[in-house]
Swiss-Prot record:
Record flagged with keyword DNA-binding: no
Main location: cytoplasm
Region: Disordered, residue numbers: 1-37, 499-589, 994-1021, 1039-1072
Gene: dia
UniProt remark on domains: The DAD domain regulates activation via by an autoinhibitory interaction with the GBD/FH3 domain. This autoinhibition is released upon competitive binding of an activated GTPase. The release of DAD allows the FH2 domain to then nucleate and elongate nonbranched actin filaments. DAD-mediated autoinhibition negatively regulates dia localization to the apical cell cortex. The N terminal basic region is enriched in basic amino acids that may mediate interaction with negatively charged phosphatidylinositol 4,5-bisphosphate (PtdIns[4,5]P(2)). It is required, but not sufficient on its own, for efficient apical localization in polarized epithelial cells.
Record's protein name: Protein diaphanous
Domain FH1: 512-596
Low complexity: bias regions: 25-34
Domain GBD/FH3: 59-431
Organism (species): Drosophila melanogaster (Fruit fly)
Length: 1091
């Protein structure tokens, strides 16, 4: 069959597809199925066109509906996108008829020429799979295939199928190793473009995890082949914006894989950057630079993670673009390629927007470009204008992400220093392998060890400071006690008529003087307590004595017989209307008690709603002295309407619930087991034998006696002396043993020992004195710190203005809450109430009165927030037992007195070895002096606590020092805990708020980015879409794939070149603005983690 007959036998070929002419089967019947060459099914109303030569007449005879239908079929066969069909469908009838005729003539001519050799898709596949054809014939076949793929309908492309795509893949793979296949590679990529110009072909390539087509296209990125690289960049960039199929990840993975096998994975973007600077001979119109820049914009704009975008951009810039950016700017400005200029503008906008977003994460951090350290200057000068500068800048940027934590920040820097040390000081005494980025660094426990060491160091330093403070406080109090003791001696000497030494020789110390007597005049004897008010009538009581604190004048004369006593002066503000005299005594009601010390009645608060009560025990004014804290307390000045209103709302009362009292376990008294200890000779001998078999077993009885005579405390430890005191037989037994020994009668070893040491006169007092000498330092150490702590704590409590303000504020809140109750208008409260503040909860049962107090102090009175810093000795004072101190002081005084008595009785040594007077005399002198000083310090502490009890109006005999300071400590610790709870809750709320804002911001940014990345094509449409690759390329070409960027919302900053010039100058900003520094973990994890 000739070529002409073969063409004729096709029955019109493409015309049959377009006009739906039914073909006759071998039996002569008309087939109603799908036509040949992928034609569409024939409908029942299709007309049969007799031949191609008659189609013009036939078109003229078509109705408008039929013409529209045929025109729509032609548009679909031409793969024209739907958004561009409207202008064509709006054409007039004559224009549409002409377009149909032109199209059919061209298709018919193309079909005749194409069918000269390749009739079906399988023909192309079989021909290209045959490797015996010459390069020229293969090129002609591929070029014809490209025309066929572009011209034929989708059904023809589907028939070409996966097998055809595989054939093109083999051609591309063969072209990599054959220089003569360069044109074939170019046409093969164009064939792939035609195949993927519909959703079916695009899904075939992008549905697999990694199709070989993507790898081959990535391998075609060679700047030495400009046309081929342009086509490959178009397809790869189009894949990146097919988000439904993860095209971006697949393209990036393909580029990385090819770079790892071809040159270096770390330089995967080098061909793309090199293409930007292709010569004029290779890229005269700068199309390659334009498509390379489009691809770079696609890579750096598509990811939603800012860190990843910055990382990619830094990697691309390190491939030489950073150094030659100014040169590329000149290339863009000199070119006439408007697309290149447009995409270079997009490149700068994307880069600046990402930098702006990066800077906005650290709005509270500013960089002082004029304040730099010498080390930074040296490093900056070393790397400036070198290839190391981008890496140095990247290191600085990474350092900004270190956690903002007091303990972990130094740990991070120490870890980084360790890494740099291992890299720079390489163990092989040479440069490390730069190709291998894995450095074996032991970091398993490094950070934890660093933090623990830092905490231990801080704790040790704090303990040292506290120890030094205690030593200074102890020395201060001891010096004051010594000065007081010396002053007493001076006064005693003056009273005895002995001239006192010069006062200049006395140390100048601040000795608290006794308080002045009450009253402004002289020093009269203390008056009896005032009588309570009495009702008028009856025998008149004697006139009341003058109130304490007022000038005492002569008492008024007694009233005449039968008359009542004169009424007391009216209270301020209590005068009768009109200023008339008060009624006669017989007509008066009960007398109002006169407030002492100039106290004024407390303000009664008008509270509208019932409130929870401050269950304190108010202090009666009559129990207060004129020096009491409550007399000077002016809590009304602290009142503010806003927080009192908040207090009324938060602590409004609800239906009273019966409080279930916690069962308090009664302390169980440990009954000592009464051991009936009987002193027997056998028991005494056994105890002495056990003692001698211990640390004294290497000494003879005579040597032990000599040690006792010499007072040798190096051998006689406190434990041995206590055992001797405990097990020593009574004096009559010792005397009896000495008599037996003197007669020369044999004695057992234990009795010989007892008889030997019994020869020492006053043995028992000697043992007690030696034991006192050894235990004296421990006894002093046991009570002296307590005395120092108690004294210092009393002074701190009395002098702390911050603590006084806290008490005033509590009095204000309590009086406000107790308005209308029996405890209202209290002048003071017992200090023990401080521990009960946490028992009062607000109306929501979520917060206590103590938490509210801590929050109120922080907001309204921040100067008093750290009042606990003024009470540094309260913790130790809470463990001070006054009875134990007094008992220890009595013991020491008694022991010193006994020692002094024994020294008087042992002035003459018993023998040459007797060193009692020599050894113990010096100790007794030092001990007496120190015990006297301790006694003065104890008296000073007791006096200060007594003054403190008068200051806060409590009974020191009922409210001991230990209980008082324990309550202060409990309140102080509870206040700190409440404040920490408030801070924690506030931080949690702030964190939630920031997290919500970050999520909303991230959602908005994600939505905006998704809007910019809105799918150009629907990859999951039920019907195959056409022209998808054209739409993707158009979106990239016009820049619509990168979205509409809001340039006005961004802060005005220097342009790219100017900013780079600024960064080139040594102006590293290191100072931080005032305000709370937003931590890296709080910003980065919330913004990126929620995305």
């Amino acid at each position: 069959m000739s070529r002409h007959e073969k063409t004729k036998s096709t029955g019109g070929g493409l015309l049959d597809s377009l006009f739906g002419r039914p073909s006759k089967s071998k039996g002569g019947t008309i087939s109603s199925g799908t036509l040949a060459h992928g034609g569409r099914p024939v409908s029942a109303d299709n007309y049969v066109v007799p031949g191609v030569e008659d189609f013009e007449q036939y078109i003229q005879q078509l109705s408008v509906a039929e013409l529209d239908a045929k025109f729509l079929e032609i548009i679909e066969d031409m793969n024209i996108p739907k958004d561009k069909r409207e202008p064509l469908l709006a054409k007039s009838k004559e224009e549409r008829q002409k377009m149909i005729m032109w199209h059919l003539k061209g298709k018919n001519s193309l079909e005749r020429s194409a069918n000269s050799r390749f009739e079906k898709p399988i023909d192309y596949v079989e021909y290209l799979q045959n490797g015996e054809h010459s390069t020229h014939k293969v090129y002609q076949c591929v070029e014809s295939l490209r025309v066929a793929l572009t011209s034929n309908p989708i059904s023809w492309i589907k028939e070409f199928g996966v097998a055809g795509i595989g054939t093109i893949e083999k051609l591309l793979a063969r072209s990599k190793n054959n220089a003569s296949y360069e044109k074939i590679e170019f046409e093969a990529i164009r064939c792939l473009k035609a195949i993927m110009n519909n959703t079916w072909g695009l899904n075939v390539v992008l549905n697999p995890d990694q199709h070989s087509v993507v790898l081959l296209l990535a391998q075609s990125l060679d700047p030495r082949k400009p046309q081929t690289m342009c086509e490959a960049l178009k397809l790869l960039a189009s894949f990146c914006i097919v988000y439904e199929r993860n095209g971006y990840e697949k393209v990036l993975r393909a580029i990385t894989t090819i770079a790892a096998t071809s040159f270096k994975a770390s330089e995967r973007f080098r061909p793309i950057v090199d293409a930007l600077f292709a010569s004029d001979q290779q890229d005269p119109k700068r199309d390659l630079a334009c498509h390379s820049l489009i691809f770079i914009n696609t890579l750096t704009n598509t990811p939603t993670d800012l860190n990843f975008r910055l990382h990619l951009r830094c990697e691309i810039m390190r491939m030489g673009l950073y150094d030659r950016l100014d040169e590329f700017t000149k290339i863009v400005e000199a070119s006439n390629n408007e697309n290149l200029q447009q995409h270079f503008k997009i490149f700068n906008e994307i880069r600046e927007d990402d930098f702006e977003e990066f800077v906005q994460r650290f709005d509270n951090v500013t960089f002082n470009m004029d304040d730099a350290t010498d080390c930074f200057d040296v490093l900056k000068n070393l790397v400036t204008d070198t290839t190391s500068e981008p890496y140095f800048l990247s290191i600085l940027q990474h350092l900004l992400y270190i956690r903002d934590d007091f303990y972990f920040r130094p740990a991070y820097y120490q870890l980084i220093e360790e890494c740099i040390s291992q890299i720079v000081f390489h163990k092989g005494y040479c440069d490390p392998n730069f190709e291998n980025r894995n450095f074996n660094i032991d970091t398993s426990l490094l950070l934890d060890d660093i933090v623990e060491k830092a905490k231990a160091k801080e704790s040790k330093r704090s303990e040292e400071y506290e120890k030094k403070i205690e030593q200074l406080e102890s020395a201060k109090q001891e010096a004051e006690a010594k000065a007081a003791h010396l002053e007493e001696k001076v006064k005693l000497m003056e009273a005895n008529g002995v001239a006192a030494p010069s006062p200049n020789k006395l140390p100048k110390v601040n000795i608290p003087m006794p308080p002045p007597p009450p009253g402004g005049g002289g020093a009269p004897p203390p008056p009896p307590p005032p009588m309570p008010g009495r009702a008028g009538g009856g025998p008149p009581p004697p006139p009341p004595p003058p109130m304490p604190g007022r000038a005492g004048g002569p008492p008024p004369p007694p009233p005449p017989p039968g008359m009542g006593g004169p009424p007391p002066p009216p209270m301020p503000g209590m005068m009768r209307p009109g200023g008339g005299p008060p009624p006669p005594p017989m007509m008066m009601g009960p007398m109002v008690p006169v407030l002492p010390h100039g106290l004024k009645p407390k303000k009664k608060w008008d509270v509208k709603n019932p409130m929870k009560r401050a269950n304190w025990k108010a202090i009666v004014p009559a129990k207060m002295s004129d020096k009491a804290f409550w007399v000077k307390c002016q809590e009304d000045k602290l009142a503010q309407d806003d927080f009192l209103a908040e207090l009324a709302v938060k602590f409004s009362s609800k239906p009273v619930k019966k409080e279930q009292k916690d069962a308090v376990d009664k302390p169980t008294t440990l009954t000592k087991k009464n051991v009936d200890l009987r002193v027997l000779d056998s028991k005494t001998a056994q105890n002495l034998a056990i003692m001698l078999g211990g640390s004294l077993k290497h000494l003879s009885y005579e040597q032990i006696k000599i040690c006792l005579l010499r007072c040798d405390t190096d051998i006689l430890s406190s434990n041995i002396l206590q055992q001797l005191i405990q097990y020593l037989p009574p004096p009559e037994h010792l005397k009896r043993l000495q008599e037996i020994k003197a007669k020369g009668e044999p004695l057992p070893p234990i009795e010989q020992f007892a008889a030997t040491i019994g020869e020492i006169k006053r043995l028992s007092p000697r043992l007690h004195n030696l034991n006192f000498k050894l235990t004296y330092a421990d006894m002093v150490q046991d009570i002296k710190p307590d005395i120092v702590a108690g004294t210092a704590a009393c002074e701190e409590i009395r002098n702390s203005k911050k603590f006084s303000k806290i008490l005033e504020l509590i009095l204000l809140l309590g009086n406000y809450m107790n308005s209308g109750s029996k405890n209202e208008a209290a002048f003071g409260f017992e200090i023990s109430y401080l521990t009960k503040l946490s028992n009062t909860k607000d109306a929501d049962n979520k917060q206590t009165l103590l938490h509210y107090l801590a929050d109120l102090v922080e907001k309204k009175f921040p100067d008093a927030l750290n009042f606990y810093d003024d009470l540094s000795h309260v913790n130790k004072a809470s463990r001070v037992n006054m009875d134990a101190i007094q008992k220890a002081m009595r013991q020491m005084n008694s022991a010193v007195k006994n020692l002094e008595t024994d020294l008087q009785n042992n002035k003459v040594p018993q023998c040459d070895d007797d060193k009692f007077s020599e050894v113990m005399g010096k100790f007794a002198e030092e001990c007496r002096q120190q015990v006297d000083v301790l006694g003065k310090m104890q008296l000073q502490m007791e006096k200060l606590y007594k003054d403190l009890s008068e200051y806060y109006a409590f009974d020191p005999s009922k409210y001991t020092m230990e209980e008082f300071f324990a309550d202060i400590k409990t309140f102080k610790d509870a206040f700190q805990a409440a404040h920490n709870d408030n801070v924690r809750v506030r931080e949690e709320l702030e964190k939630k708020r920031r997290l919500q804002e970050a999520r909303e911001q991230s959602a908005r940014e994600q939505q905006e980015r998704q809007q910019r990345k809105k799918a150009v094509v629907d990859m999951d449409a039920p019907q195959t879409q056409e022209g998808v690759m054209d739409s993707l390329l158009e979106a990239l070409q016009t820049g619509s794939a990168f979205g509409q960027r809001n340039r006005q919302a961004r802060r005005q900053r220097p342009a790219g070149a100017e900013r780079r010039a600024q960064l080139s100058r040594s102006r590293s900003r290191t100072r931080v603005t005032n305000g709370q520094l937003m931590t890296r973990e709080m910003i980065l994890n919330e913004v990126l983690g929620s995305a």
